[in-house]
A protein has these predicted regions:
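Short, charged, intrinsically disordered terminal tails
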Residues: 93, 141-144, 250-252
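Short hydrophobic/aromatic patch on the recognition helix
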Residues: 185, 189, 233-234, 238
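N-terminal regulatory/effector-sensing and dimerization cores
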Residues: 2-98
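Terminal helix-turn-helix DNA-binding modules in bacterial transcription factors
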Residues: 168-173, 191-229, 251-252
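Short, Lys/Arg-enriched, Trp-marked, Pro/Gly-tolerant hinge/linker segments that flank
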Residues: 99-178, 191-199, 203
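Short coil turns linking two alpha-helices in DNA-binding domains
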Residues: 181, 229-230
Length: 252
C-alpha cells in the first residue's frame, strides 16, 4: 500500500496500521510481528505458505515469524502489525500460537466497518490508531488479562535496544546492563520474544527506518535513522521482512 491518497501507514510503540488500497503482491517473507489482515467491503485476500497452494481468506491472522506470500491487489483493507512481546501481542500469541495463518470470523466485522468508514472520511491518524486498537481488543478479549507479563529484565533490554539503534547494538553490553550472563540472556531473550537477539535488533532497525521513511525522509536518510549501513541494506531487509520494496509504501 502506498502511503499516499490511496493509503496510510500509522505507527505506534509496539505496532502499526497499514490502511488503504493493496498494491503489488508480497513475495514469500516473514516478519517479527503478528499480522492481522482485514479486507473491507466483503473483499478478501490470498495467502500462501511454503509448500502449500494459495488460500483465500475474508480476514486472517498470521503468527509472528510465519513465512508467507500475500496478494490482494486492488482491495481496500487494513493490515495491523503487533509486536509479539507487547501486551496485545502476547495475548494474540496466546490465542493463536498453534496456527500459522488462521481465518477470522465476522465477530470483528463492526470494527472492520468502522476502520473502512474512518479511512474513507479521511479521519485523523489518532482516530485510525484508536480504531485499530479496538479491533485488537475485540480479538484478544479476556485473554489479555491472562497473558504472562514479560520478564522485567528483557523488558529493560528492549528499551535499551531502542535507545541505541542509531549505532552498534551488541548482545554482551545489553546483557551486562540487565545483570545477566550472555548465555543466560540469549536464552531468555529467545524465550520471551520468540526470536534471536540479532533478528530482533534488525526488526527494530527496520521499524525505526520505516517510521522515518513514511514521514518523508529519503531512503538514505531513513536507513541511517535506523542504523543501517546504507539504503541498499535497508531495502534488502524490508523486502525480506515484508515481501515488497520500500518504494511500494512511498510517502506523499
Amino acid at each position: 500500500m502506498k502511503a499516499s491518497a490511496t493509503g496510510r501507514i500509522l505507527m505506534w510503540r509496539g505496532g502499526s496500521l497499514w490502511i488503504g488500497l493493496a498494491g503489488e503482491p508480497a513475495g514469500m517473507h516473514a516478519h517479527h510481528a503478528v499480522q492481522i489482515t482485514l479486507p473491507f467491503n466483503g473483499g478478501g485476500a490470498r495467502f500462501q505458505v511454503p509448500g502449500e497452494p494459495w488460500t483465500n481468506y475474508s480476514a486472517a491472522i498470521v503468527a509472528a515469524q510465519q513465512p508467507h506470500a500475500f496478494e490482494a491487489r486492488g482491495q481496500m483493507m487494513a493490515q495491523i502489525f503487533v509486536e509479539p512481546e507487547s501486551r496485545d501481542g502476547r495475548a494474540l500469541q496466546l490465542l493463536h500460537r498453534a496456527q500459522g495463518i488462521a481465518a477470522l470470523d465476522d465477530s470483528i466485522s463492526s470494527e472492520v466497518e468502522a476502520l473502512a468508514a474512518a479511512f474513507e472520511s479521511r479521519a485523523t491518524g489518532t482516530a485510525l490508531i484508536e480504531l485499530a486498537h479496538s479491533a485488537i481488543r475485540k480479538l484478544v478479549g479476556p485473554s489479555q488479562s491472562t497473558a504472562t507479563p514479560p520478564d522485567a529484565r528483557i523488558a529493560q533490554a528492549l528499551e535499551l535496544i531502542r535507545e541505541r539503534l542509531s549505532g552498534p547494538v551488541s548482545l554482551k553490553p545489553i546483557a551486562q546492563a540487565v545483570h545477566l550472563s550472555p548465555d543466560r540472556f540469549r536464552h531468555l531473550f529467545m524465550e520471551e520474544t520468540g526470536v534471536g537477539f540479532r533478528p530482533y535488533v534488525l526488526w527494530q532497525r527496520l521499524d525505526c527506518s520505516l517510521a522515518a521513511y513514511v514521514k518523508g525522509s529519503t531512503l538514505t536518510e531513513a536507513a541511517h535513522d535506523g542504523g543501517f549501513a546504507d539504503s541498499a541494506h535497508f531495502s534488502r531487509t524490508f523486502r525480506k521482512m515484508f515481501g515488497i520494496a520500500p518504494a511500494s509504501v512511498r510517502p506523499e
